[in-house]
Swiss-Prot record:
Name of protein: Trp operon repressor
Lineage: superkingdom: Bacteria
Gene from which the chain derives: trpR
Species this chain originates from: Salmonella arizonae (strain ATCC BAA-731 / CDC346-86 / RSK2980)
Subcellular localization: Cytoplasm
Keyword Transmembrane helix: no
Length: 108
């Protein structure tokens, strides 16, 4: 019996399909106003906190007023986490960056 490599194309496709299934479930939960209970079910408190921190990282990177080191100190996040956020933001589609600018940086 051959075990499938965790890095095989078939496994990658399966994981991608599982991700898309979750995204569709989340979309449906918003339509039915069940998104908060669903996310509470699916994510641990630490995972929810990490997502909130990632939003703050992206927001501050878009704002561009703090260095990555200052951001690390402000948020208590690891420099590797901030660097990954920065690299992801650099490779994000222009439309997504523009949308994030509008949504995250709008005046409160």
């Amino acid at each position: 019996m051959t075990q499938q490599s965790p890095y095989s194309a078939a496994m990658a496709e399966q994981r991608h399909q599982e991700w898309l299934r979750f995204v569709e479930l989340l979309k449906q939960s918003y339509a039915e106003d069940l998104h908060i209970p669903l996310l509470n079910l699916m994510l641990t408190p630490d995972e929810r906190e990490a997502l909130g921190t990632r939003v703050r990282i992206i927001e501050e990177l878009l704002r561009g007023e703090m260095s990555q080191r200052e951001l690390k100190n402000e948020l208590g996040a690891g420099i590797a986490t901030i660097t990954r956020g920065s690299n992801s933001l650099k490779s994000a589609p222009v439309e997504l960056r523009q949308w994030l600018d509008q949504v995250l940086l709008k005046e409160a």
